[in-house]
Amino acid sequence: MNITIVSVGKLKEKYLKQGIDEYKKRLNAYAKVSIIEVADEKAPETMSEAEMKEVKRKEGERILSSIAPDAFVITLEIEGKMLGSEQLAKKLDELATYGKSKVVFVIGGSLGISQDVQRRSDLALSFSKMTFPHQLMRLVLIEQVYRSFRINRGEPYHK
């Protein structure tokens, strides 16, 4: 399986990079994993609704250009469906079983994702009703993907 994480913005925090690199290394035994960072749009502190929509549209274009046409797309959204670790593992297992070998997870920028990206999504996934920094979500997401593969293989890790 090919797992791609498309995320808006550049990861700056060293401790997050180290954690992500560790899980990416662990995942190599199960899947090919790549992380694509698309540029975030420069935006002033205060914006009108139209300006926010334009920022999301531009970031959305960059996200969509990074997604293969045959990929199964999972967007991370506050209003998405909440799944437990076992349910996410089952979903990834089902995708592999039914020939969906390319799975793309999308983490939007600070304003969220555009409507075009939402329309391209096959599954809107929520980790919580709370808001998290999108850089931190990369680490949380890649850990959950790793956990999913361990669950699906019946290997110890999941508790």
Swiss-Prot record:
Known catalytic reactions: pseudouridine(1915) in 23S rRNA + S-adenosyl-L-methionine = N(3)-methylpseudouridine(1915) in 23S rRNA + S-adenosyl-L-homocysteine + H(+)
SUPFAM superfamilies in alphabetical order: alpha/beta knot
Class in the EC hierarchy, top level: transferase
Gene Ontology, cellular component aspect: cytoplasm
Domain of life where this protein originates: Bacteria
CDD domains: RlmH-like (cd18081)
Binding site for S-adenosyl-L-methionine: L76, G108, F127, S128, K129, M130, T131, F132
Pfam annotation, one family: SPOUT_MTase
GO MF annotation list: rRNA (pseudouridine-N3-)-methyltransferase activity
Keyword Membrane found: no
Primary subcellular site in the record, as a coarse category: cytoplasm
Keywords from the UniProt entry: Cytoplasm, Methyltransferase, rRNA processing, S-adenosyl-L-methionine, Transferase
UniProt keyword Amino-acid biosynthesis, yes or no: no
Location(s) in or outside the cell: Cytoplasm
EC number(s) given by UniProt: 2.1.1.177
Assembly and binders: Homodimer.
Family of this protein: Belongs to the RNA methyltransferase RlmH family.
HAMAP family: 23SrRNA_methyltr_H
Role played: Specifically methylates the pseudouridine at position 1915 (m3Psi1915) in 23S rRNA.
Descriptive protein name: Ribosomal RNA large subunit methyltransferase H
